[in-house]
Amino acid sequence: MSLLKEFKEFAMRGNVMDLAVAVVMGVAFNKIVTALVDGIIMPCVGLLLGGVNIAGLSFTVGDAQIKWGNFLQNVIDFIIVAFAIFVLIKLINLLQRKKANEPEPVTSEIQLLTEIRDLLARNSSKI
């Protein structure tokens, strides 16, 4: 089997395609969360702290500038993304549990076989 053919089979497997979609959606979601944190949450926190730009907060030790405000902003980004993923996974697990608890629909063949069994059982008891 050629290397190209093996790669094509690998790339077209369901799991790989699902992963690719998840990565693209994750990148897009990260942009939304970053915009939320940078544009809404951090300015509000800055207003509560007296109009301070949180991302610009830093202190200097010797020649090194420690940008702790930027770090704080990224921590808030991470917490929001992690919480959103947690909620999404909880929702998916809940839906999967509900689906697993639903009885499987009875097919027409099974229903017909059940009726035949019941008729045979009734007829054998009459003999």
Swiss-Prot record:
One of its GO terms (cellular component) is plasma membrane. GO terms for molecular function: mechanosensitive monoatomic ion channel activity. The keyword Ion transport applies. The chain crosses the membrane at residues 9-29, 32-52, 75-95. It holds the Pfam family MscL. The keyword Membrane applies. Channel that opens in response to stretch forces in the membrane lipid bilayer. May participate in the regulation of osmotic pressure changes within the cell. This is Large-conductance mechanosensitive channel. It comes from Legionella pneumophila (strain Corby).
